[in-house]
């Protein structure tokens, strides 16, 4: 390799940035040092050594010699999967590992491309072998559902203009513009866009990052604000053909945004191969490849969140645990975005009004600290940048209108020009203006913060006054009917604009959270801040758009308040869920608010909660909650408790010594339960430590002045949101594997201790052997113990006990911003990823199999859906203050009409909520349909499924995730 890079000019030039050489050293060794080498790239020369120098930038430590051979043969995406499976581990800067993988791909690109093609062909062949003869009509079933719609009579007090709130007379075919946008969404391959990262890097190269042009340390807020303004002033203003909204997140029709100060360099190794990978391939132009490799990534290779913590805290244990992927995954390495902003403020005041508010705050506070003055100045600069982008778009709209030959489109562009000259700089007055202002604000926020979980919030509440004002101006029924149709189309354009970008996911991410988009949650219904029914006209218009488009993002969540909201509304939620197969997610207002009681939030703030990212509650515009700061694999603690602190996959004696099963150290079940909670507490303590370090990193590397300007109290406190400026602060964890842990603990308690039918050492031997040679024991543990979801009060008690420990252990900590930690029980798709990294369990679950999603019971817990419903609803809401994901796969009876199916779904959801259940999401698909989609993905490109908190297109998921969905319990209704 060294010789090739030294002698081939085409490779030698890859060792340069735009103005210097890329100097770094990569070490390679096995755990037992049977192999030890390094390669250095310095001053344009590559050199191999027979040892690893102490100053190596990154060292890859392989499990054995075979992994070294695999490393050199596999394409970059598969190399990262070796890391995920703990076949090798890293010490040092991950950016340089990815740069080295990029160099390998340049050297072996042709071979790797052939390997990827071979891998794809093998997958197709496997599907063909596994598929059986299925009903050809399966592929058309979803289309048929869209043809069946029911009407309703308005009973909701907040609905003023819709005689039929279900809007049953409208279908997608009534909106050719949306049909066109949807086709682009479903057929266009995403492309990596370098615009944002390139412009920001240009500014920092010119003006400095750590110090300014005069050598003085930068105030991070001012540095970020000035770079942001430069970005917004220089972005390409784009208005897509036929769109009613202006502006784009990237320069591509569907663009992948690069955030190099967080996780952007994780794609470095795939700059050549990203277009050929089997899952979620990305287009990447030669210009983008060159820009990222020669300019962007070199600048940020040591200026990102992981590397700031590594250098500041000497690669702490908490960080090393995260980088093994098996026990927890820290989202703050990629984002601090899970929050909801005060969009009503932007609509009410505009950027100009908010700037005036900032000036008034500074004038009123004569003793303002330097921090406050700098923070508020940074907010103003960012708001000016957003307004500048809107002005550029207005000029573009005017130019497009002048060149447009079609009179109807010219009129739309002229109207858009007027709108952009008004908002977001000033207050919005019409629905057109409000949606454009929100969209432009949304673009602006994603130019500052990672597009992962940043959520829109209660958009029906914000838009209703504008819709009502527009309708009040109309005199005839015909005018109002036409305007309702336009409102549907406008909202449809907004939904489709939200699909114009995707998060940057290296191939390893396809296994951790495959199929996920940006998870931009919107929330409908519920109650108002003063406690009244919040369902309104826009609630139903948004539900109509959700129904006809059936797209994965925005992630639609619906609040249902049993005391205030109508059955008509809940039935509509169920009908939309039936037609789309997977959305919206439904939440019990009373249970969610009960879960948050411990924090003493003001009632008006609590009633204004909305879902964030997946399902997590945030108090809209007042709460920096980072509700998905981490994914915690609770099952890892069980494995460590069974192995005296040793983690089997990592082969690491990392946890505290809590006792040996073989030595008979656990005389009682309580002894073992104590060992489990000690290990889980150890993992929680470490995850919190690393999360707090990353929080500090964000405050230094990427404070967020624009976001802070739309977050209550940041202005008054004079403190950025990353430093605790928001009115309410917290951090939320997702605890994964509750049902699997509960079932395993029930097996241990019942069979080992209560009934003494098996010895603990015997059970452990069977678990260690993946139950091979222990069929009788496997049958015993899977059939003779009451499971969570079976209707067993004892199993529910065990689940509550585990959930309470997680809640209390997280709740004992405070985050970097001074707020509490919350605990939720949902999993995105990490129940699959963590499952593949986990051995067999006492419950009988075999090694490598997925955990149950969220806190959904194990598929064989009960053949009766009501048992599942009762057990999940029996969990104590106080322990679930970051919400849950209860996934149910239901299959309508072929003999039932559309109306009857909706009634059945309504009955189950209503019963669950009446019992106190917090959240429910349904996949209304058959196992046969999913199997057919695996075999014939071309027939199911828009088949929507609910994973655990978010939606995905089934055909974009990795095989393990598809099988997990297929293997979920299927209940007839």
Kindly give the residue locations of the regions a language model identified.
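Conserved catalytic cores of very large enzyme subunits
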Residues: 145-375, 408, 412-415, 426, ...
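Extended non-globular scaffold/tether segments
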Residues: 377-388
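Cofactor-pocket helix-loop regions in the catalytic cores of large enzyme subunits
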Residues: 420
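Feature captures hydrophobic
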Residues: 1-145
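Charged, alpha-helical scaffolding/interaction elements associated with membrane systems
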Residues: 73, 85, 403-405, 472-473, ...
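Short, Lys/Glu-rich amphipathic helical modules
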Residues: 397-413
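Generic structural signal for well-ordered, non-membrane alpha-helices
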Residues: 62, 77, 388-399, 461, ...
């Amino acid at each position: 390799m060294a010789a090739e890079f030294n002698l081939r000019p085409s490779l030698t030039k890859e060792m340069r940035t735009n103005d210097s050489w890329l100097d770094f050293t990569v070490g390679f060794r096995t755990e037992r040092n049977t192999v030890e080498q390094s390669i250095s790239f310095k001053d344009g020369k590559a050199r191999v050594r027979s040892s690893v120098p102490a100053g190596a930038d990154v060292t890859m430590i392989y499990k054995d010699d075979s992994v070294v051979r695999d490393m050199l043969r596999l394409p970059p995406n598969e190399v990262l999967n070796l890391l995920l499976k703990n076949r090798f581990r890293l010490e040092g800067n991950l950016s340089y590992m990815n740069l080295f993988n990029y160099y390998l791909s340049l050297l072996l690109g042709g071979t790797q491309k052939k390997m990827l093609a071979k891998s794809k062909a093998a997958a197709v062949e496997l599907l063909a072998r596994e598929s059986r003869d299925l009903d050809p009509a399966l592929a058309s079933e979803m289309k048929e559902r869209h043809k069946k719609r029911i009407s309703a009579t308005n009973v909701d007090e907040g609905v003023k203009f819709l005689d039929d709130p279900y809007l049953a007379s409208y279908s997608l075919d009534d909106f050719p513009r949306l049909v066109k946008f949807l086709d682009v969404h479903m057929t266009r391959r995403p492309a990596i866009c370098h615009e944002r990262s390139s412009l920001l890097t240009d500014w920092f190269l010119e003006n400095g990052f750590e110090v300014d042009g005069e050598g003085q340390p930068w105030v991070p807020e001012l540095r970020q604000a000035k770079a942001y303004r430069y970005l917004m002033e220089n972005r390409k203003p784009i208005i897509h053909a036929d769109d009613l909204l202006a502006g784009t997140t990237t320069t591509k029709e569907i663009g992948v945004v690069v955030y190099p100060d967080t996780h952007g360099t994780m794609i470095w190794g795939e700059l050549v191969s990203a277009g050929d990978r089997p899952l979620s391939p990305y287009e990447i132009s030669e210009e983008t490849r060159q820009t990222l490799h020669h300019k962007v990534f070199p600048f940020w290779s040591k200026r990102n969140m992981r590397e700031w913590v590594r250098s500041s805290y000497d690669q702490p244990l908490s960080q090393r645990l995260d980088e093994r992927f098996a026990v927890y995954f820290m989202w703050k390495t990629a984002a601090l975005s899970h929050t909801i902003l005060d969009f009503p403020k932007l609509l009410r005041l505009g950027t100009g009004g908010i700037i005036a508010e900032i000036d008034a705050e500074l004038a009123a506070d004569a003793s303002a600290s330097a921090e406050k003055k700098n923070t508020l100045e940074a907010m103003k600069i960012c708001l000016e940048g957003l307004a500048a982008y809107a002005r550029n778009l207005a000029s573009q709209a005017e130019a497009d209108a002048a060149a447009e030959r079609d009179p109807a489109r010219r009129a739309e562009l002229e109207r858009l020009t007027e709108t952009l000259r008004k908002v977001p700089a000033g207050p919005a007055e019409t629905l057109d203006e409000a949606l454009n202002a929100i969209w432009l604000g949304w673009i602006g926020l994603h130019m500052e913060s990672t597009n992962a979980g940043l959520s829109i919030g209660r958009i029906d509440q914000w838009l209703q006054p504008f819709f009502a004002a527009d309708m009040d101006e109309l005199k005839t029924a015909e005018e109002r009917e036409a305007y309702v149709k336009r409102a549907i189309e406008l909202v449809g354009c907004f939904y489709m604009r939200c699909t114009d970008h995707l998060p940057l996911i290296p191939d390893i991410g396809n296994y951790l959270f495959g199929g996920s988009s940006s998870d931009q949650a919107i929330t409908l219904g519920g109650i108002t801040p003063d406690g009244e029914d919040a369902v309104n006209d826009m609630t139903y218009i948004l539900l109509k758009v959700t129904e006809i488009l059936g797209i994965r993002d925005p992630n639609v969540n619906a609040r249902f308040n049993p005391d205030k909201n109508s059955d008509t509304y809940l039935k509509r939620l169920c009908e939309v869920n039936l037609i789309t197969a997977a959305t919206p997610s439904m939440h019990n207002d009373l249970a969610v608010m009960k879960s948050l009681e411990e924090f003493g939030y003001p009632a008006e703030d609590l009633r204004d909660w909305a879902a964030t990212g997946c399902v997590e509650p945030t108090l809209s515009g007042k709460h920096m909650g980072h509700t998905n700061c981490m994914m915690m694999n609770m099952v890892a603690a069980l494995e460590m408790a069974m192995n005296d602190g040793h983690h089997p996959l990592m082969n690491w004696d990392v946890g505290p010594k809590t006792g040996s099963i073989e030595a008979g150290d656990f005389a009682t079940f309580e002894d073992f339960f104590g060992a489990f909670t000690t290990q889980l507490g150890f993992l929680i303590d470490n995850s919190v430590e690393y999360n707090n370090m990353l929080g500090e990193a964000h405050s230094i590397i990427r404070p967020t002045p624009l976001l802070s300007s739309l977050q209550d109290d940041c202005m008054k406190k004079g403190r950025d949101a990353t430093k605790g400026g928001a009115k309410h602060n917290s951090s939320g964890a997702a605890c994964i594997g509750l049902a699997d842990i509960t079932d395993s603990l029930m097996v241990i308690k019942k069979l080992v201790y209560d009934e003494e039918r098996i010895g603990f050492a015997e059970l452990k031997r069977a678990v260690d052997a993946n139950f091979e040679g222990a069929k009788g024991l496997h049958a015993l543990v899977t059939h003779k113990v009451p499971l969570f979801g079976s209707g067993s009060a004892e199993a529910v008690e065990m689940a509550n006990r585990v959930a309470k420990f997680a809640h209390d252990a997280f709740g004992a900590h405070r985050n970097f911003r001074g707020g509490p930690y919350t605990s939720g029980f949902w999993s995105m798709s990490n129940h699959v990823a963590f499952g593949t990294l986990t051995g067999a369990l006492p419950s009988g679950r075999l090694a490598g199999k997925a955990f149950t999603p969220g806190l959904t019971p194990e598929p064989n817990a009960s053949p009766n859906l009501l048992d599942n419903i009762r057990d999940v609803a029996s969990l104590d809401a106080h322990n679930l203050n970051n919400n849950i994901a209860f996934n149910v796969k239901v299959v309508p009876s072929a003999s039932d009409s559309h109306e009857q199916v909706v009634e059945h779904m309504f009955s189950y959801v209503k019963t669950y909520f009446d019992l106190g259940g917090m959240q429910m999401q349904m996949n209304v698909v058959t196992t046969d349909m999913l199997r057919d989609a695996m075999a014939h993905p071309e027939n199911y490109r828009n088949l929507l499924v609910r994973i655990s908190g978010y939606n995905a297109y089934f055909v974009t998921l990795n095989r393990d995730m598809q099988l997990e969905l297929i293997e979920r319990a299927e209940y007839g209704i």
